[in-house]
């Protein structure tokens, strides 16, 4: 159960998890931009799978932060 209220933007109702998804997506893009020049993707077997797991971990951490 989230402590955030339901957001209403231009008459559209968004659940509280929507803010957590957007924050984790923004943090994912920043972190990916930082990791690409370091060359860590050369050691990753499947970059798309790595990105999905990274986003999942970030979403979990942010959702635990807000709950």
Curated annotation (Swiss-Prot):
Primary localization: membrane
Cell membrane recorded as keyword: yes
Transmembrane regions listed in the UniProt entry: 3-23, 43-63
Keyword Membrane: yes
Keyword set, alphabetical order: Cell membrane, Membrane, Transmembrane, Transmembrane helix
Disulphides: none
Membrane topology: Multi-pass membrane protein
InterPro entries: DUF1656
Entries under Pfam families matching the protein: DUF1656
Record-level GO cellular component terms: plasma membrane
Cell compartment(s), UniProt: Cell membrane
The family this protein is said to belong to: Belongs to the AaeX family.
The protein's name: Protein AaeX
Origin species: Yersinia enterocolitica serotype O:8 / biotype 1B (strain NCTC 13174 / 8081)
Underlying gene: aaeX
């Amino acid at each position: 159960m989230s402590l955030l209220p339901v957001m209403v933007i231009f008459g559209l109702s968004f659940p509280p998890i929507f803010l957590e998804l957007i924050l984790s997506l923004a943090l994912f893009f920043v972190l990916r931009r930082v990791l690409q020049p370091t060359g860590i993707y050369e050691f990753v077997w499947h970059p798309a799978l790595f990105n999905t797991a990274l986003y999942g971990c970030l979403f979990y951490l942010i959702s635990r932060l807000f709950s």
